[in-house]
């Protein structure tokens, strides 16, 4: 399998972490949605990441669809998303809050990165910031004091929440200061220390920009800034 995309994307990263967690070997194609847009569209017509190219050449797009396939291959006993009932619904709600946070952080980042300063729309940034912070507080209220969202076993809710938190930290120059999140910070630190997570940190080249800024961005991503 070949995973297309860079680890500065939380959607690519949650797929990569899931692949490592399930013990599924894969190669990487580190195309950028910006600098490699044409090549990206040849793989995914939308030019978005992640894509997963299966061994037979079939291309899966969208992280949720990819993760669904990985769970199917892994089987019900190893799947990262609970099979049914309240535990599944709770995991899906947690994942939805986390991916919603990602989308809000992306919207704020694009406002700063892609618009001329005179066209940045402060009310739109504030709306997204409020939505992001509300989701953060909801996740903090629901986060466990010990262990994982999935109880004694890390599951997809944990992976997606931790990937989303890393991305939000990465974007903190535009979102800060973040609210106090002791339970989420504990869970994030525990997860980010696992080899399955450390193998999926973005390279300096993937963060881009001047070297010192890229290093600072990586430190925020890791939660060490």
Language model features by range: what are they?
Residues 78-83, 148-152, 177-178, 198-203:
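Short, hydrophobic secondary-structure boundary micro-motifs
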Residues 201-225:
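Acidic/histidine-enriched, glycine/proline-rich intrinsically disordered or flexible terminal extensions
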Residues 1-123:
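GST-like domain detector, emphasizing the conserved glutathione-binding G-site
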Residues 98-189:
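GST-like fold's C-terminal all-alpha helical module
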Residues 141, 191-209:
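Charged/polar, low-hydrophobicity segments characteristic of intrinsically disordered regions
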Residues 67, 71, 92-95, 136, ...:
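Non-transmembrane alpha-helical segments in soluble domains
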């Amino acid at each position: 399998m070949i995973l297309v995309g860079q680890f500065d994307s939380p959607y690519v990263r949650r797929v990569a972490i899931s692949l490592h967690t399930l013990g599924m070997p894969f190669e990487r194609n580190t195309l950028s949605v910006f600098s490699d847009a044409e090549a990206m569209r040849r793989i995914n017509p939308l030019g978005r990441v992640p894509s997963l190219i299966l061994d037979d050449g079939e291309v899966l797009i969208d992280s949720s669809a990819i993760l669904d396939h990985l769970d199917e291959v892994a089987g019900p006993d190893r799947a990262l998303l609970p099979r049914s009932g309240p535990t599944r619904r709770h995991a899906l709600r947690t994942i939805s809050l986390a991916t919603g946070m990602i989308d809000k952080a992306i919207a704020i980042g694009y406002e700063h990165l892609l618009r001329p300063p005179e066209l940045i729309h402060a009310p739109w940034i504030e709306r997204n910031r409020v939505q992001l912070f509300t989701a953060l507080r909801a996740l903090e209220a629901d986060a466990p004091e010990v262990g994982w969202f999935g109880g004694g076993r890390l599951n997809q809710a944990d992976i997606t929440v931790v990937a989303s938190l890393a991305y939000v930290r990465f974007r903190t120059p535009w979102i800060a200061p973040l609210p106090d999140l002791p339970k989420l910070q504990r869970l994030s630190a525990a997860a980010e220390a696992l080899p399955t997570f450390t193998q999926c940190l973005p390279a300096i080249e993937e963060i881009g920009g001047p070297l010192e800024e890229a290093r600072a961005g990586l430190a925020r991503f890791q939660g060490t800034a």
